[in-house]
Amino acid sequence: MRKTVFAILTALSLIAAVAPSSLAGPKKSRKAAKTEAPAPPKKTPYQKFSTKKGIKVAGEGLKVYRDGKKVWLEVPDSLMGSKIVLSTVVDKSSSEWVPVGKSVSPQKVFVLSRTDSMLVLQEPGAIISVKDTTMQAALGKAGLLPVRYAFPLKYRNGDTTAVVVDATRLFSPSNKDAFSLKGVNIDDTFSAWDEGTPVADFSEIIAPVAYPRSVGVRQAVSFHVSPYLPAGGGRAYVFEGQKERIDGEFITTVTLLPECGITIRETDRHIGVRNVPFKEYSSEKGIRSGRTARRWNISKDKRLTVYVDTLFPEAWYQAIRKGIEAWNPAFEEIGITRAIDVRRYPSYGGFRAEDPLVSKVMADDDGRREEIRTALFGDNSTGELLSFTMTIPAGFIDNVRYEAFYNIADADARYRTYDMPESALCEIVRARVMQAFGGVLGLEPNYAGSQAYSPAQLRSPSFTKVHGITASVTDDVLFNIFAREGDRERGLVTIVDRIGPYDRLAIKWLYSSFPEGTDEKKALTSVIAPYTGAEYRYVPVSGKTYMDVRALPGDLGNDPEACFDERVRHLRAVMENAYSWIGDEDLEMSSFRILLPERIALQFFAASRTLCYNIGGVYNDDSGMRAVPKDFQKHILRKVNDFYTTFSLPPSATDLFHFSGAVSSFDGLFRTNYANQSGFFGRVRMVAFAADKAASGYPASEYLDDLTDLLTANIRKGQVCKEDEFPVSLLMAMGLMSNSPMMQHSYQEAFHRSNGLIDSFPEDEALAPVLSGIPVTSLSDLDGDCYNAMERIRSILEKALRAEGDPNKIGILEYLLTIAQAALGMK
C-alpha cells in the first residue's frame, strides 16, 4: 500500500513538473517562428520603378528606361562634369530620299551637372584657351555655363550612386535638339524647309537601346514638313500651306564623350580644314577669337579603325579598303604607321554597326541617289572627330556609268558598254572613296588641285606615273580628260589613283605632333613654309561666285581653254559613237539610253559654265587680287557664243540625240539655253567686281555691250527667221533685270497694272544674282549699266519690228518689246 501511494505521488509530481513546460512550449516556438521569418521590407521608390511591369531597360552605369510613352535616364554621380552628345540617325525610312544612317539632328553637346534637386544639361560654349594662371583662376570663378535642360531628380538608385530623371522631352520628336529634318530631300525636286512637326498619334517608342558608351531609344515617328525649292541668290520658294509626310524609324541616343584627345590647332589660310570656333584669354592681350581644326586623335598609339558593310561584294570591299588606306602613306611620312585600318563587319555577336562611335562604310539600296555621302560624328565643342558614316547608294553605279561614258569612253574601251567590267567599275569606286575620305579626315575640298599641272604633263605617261593627275584628290576631278585612245596601254594614268602632294602636306600640318613646350603655331608655319609650288596651293571655294578661277568645278590642267576643248572633244566622240556602243536591243528603252541625251547636253553646259567663270575672274592669294586679262575674258565670251550658235549634230547621232517638247533638236536646245546655262548673266556682277577691285579694265558696261552684240546679232541683221532664237532675247532682258533692282521694281509695277497681261518676273535660279562674297559698294553703277543695256535692246527691237512683215513674228517682237518697256518704266 505504502509503495502504491508513493508511486502515485511520484507520478503526479512528474506530471506537475513537466506540464508547465509542455504547455508553454508551443507558445514559445510560435514566437520564435515569428522572429525567424520577419515580414519582407517595403520596396524603395527606385525598386518599385525599376521592377515595374512592362518597363524595359538598357545600358550599364548610364541606363535608359522605356516606360510606356516615357523615357527615363539613370545617370551615375561619377559622370557629373562629363560631356554627352545628343544625336539621331535614320534606321528605317519609307522614303528613298531619306537614307538609312543619315543624321537628322544638330549633334548638340552638353555638360552633365547636378544640383540638390535637378539633373542639369549645360551648353559648353566655345573652346577656351587660357594663356596664364591669372586668367585661369578668374575664369574658374566666373565659368558658369548656360543651362539648356533641367530635369527634377525623381529617384536614387539602390546604393545612392546614381540619379533617375524623366527625360522624355529630351528624346521627344518635338525636340529640335534631337530631331531636325531641315534640308532633307523629300523627292528629286523638293527639300524640307523646316525641322518637321511630328504627326499626332503616329509616334511610338519601340525599345531602349544601348552601346558601350551610348544609350537611347528606337522610335517610329511620322513628320510633316513644308517643301521648298531653291531659287538662287539665297532665296527659296516655300510652300508652307502644303505638308509632305516622312515616315521612319529613328535611333536617338546620348553618347558619353571620351576625354578630349586633341589640342587646339588654329586654322591657317594655306590649308583647308573643317573647323569650330574657340576663344583665347590672356591677361596681356585680352580676348581673341579664332577657329580650330576638326581632327581625329590619331597618333603612334591610337589608330582609326573602319568597318565595311558585308553587303558589298569582295571586289568592292577591296576597292573601298584601298581607297581609304591610300591615305596611310601621308601618315607614314610623320611617323604613324597603319594609321587607318579597314576591316569587314565582325561576325561576333557583340558588334553593333549602329553604335554612334563605330566608323563604317555602309551599302544603301537607294537607287535614285548617285553620290557617296559622309556624315561626321564628334565633339563639336572641341573639334575632335570620333566616328563617321560613309554611305554608298545603289544609284552610285548608274552615275559611274554616265561619268565614264561621256568623259573617257572614247579613250578607254572598257567604258563603252552599259555592263562595264568589274575591274573598271572598282577603279572608280576606289577613286571616289579616296576622295570622300579626305573630308572624313577633316580636310575641306581643294579645287585648286586639278589646276596644278599643264596639259603636256597630263599627256605624259612618265609624269603621271609619278605624280598622278591632280595635286589633291579632294578636288572633284575623276578622269584624265587629256587621254586619247591607246594612252592607257602606253602607261598614261587615266583616273585618280593616289593622294597628291597637297594632300600629304595637309595631313602633315593637321596630324603632326610636337614635344611639350613647343610653340605649335610657329612649328606649323615652318611645316608649310618650304612648299610654295602650284601643287601645294589651296584655294577655298566661295559659293557660286568662285572668287579665284584656280578653284573651279569640273576643270583639269592649268589651261582653261584647253580643258574646255578636251571636254567637248570627248562629248562629240560619244555622240558620234553612242548608238553603236549601246545599240543592244535590251537597252532600247532603258533609263540609261533615254536619259543619255539630257546628260550629254548638261555636260556641254557644265563645260562652258566652267570656262565662263574666267569672265570677271580673279586670282586671289597672298600677293593680292589680280584680274583675268581683259582680252582673254572677251575671247572666252566669243568662243562660247560661237560654239553654241554654230553647233551641228553629227549625222550618226540623229537617231539617239533628240528630245520631245517644244525644242526637239539638240542644236535648237543649245541656241535656246546656252546663254543662260553658260552663266553669261550671272557673271555680270563679277565683271563689275573685277573692274572695281582688281583693275581688270573690263567694266560691266562694256561687257553688257559685248553680250548684247552677240545675243541680238540675228535680230539686228533682220534675220528673225528661227523662232528658237527668240527666247535668247527674252533671257537677255530677264538677265539684265536680275542684276538691276530698279528694273525689277518697274517690271513688277507694270505687271500689277496690266493685271497679269505680261509675265511676272521669273525667279530662275540661273538668272538670279549671286551676291555671296561681292561687296554691294562695288556694284553702285551696275543698275545704271543694266538700264542702258536694256535701252539698247529696246531700240534694237523697235527697229526690227518696223522692218518685219510676218504677222507671227511681229507678235513675238511686240511681246519682247513690252517686256523691255516695262522694265524701263515706260507706260
What do these predicted ranges mean?
Residues 9-17:
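Bacterial N-terminal signal peptides
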Residues 16-26:
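Boundary at the C-terminal end of the N-terminal hydrophobic targeting segment
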Residues 325-336, 438-439, 443, 479, ...:
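Sec-exported extracytoplasmic/periplasmic mature domains
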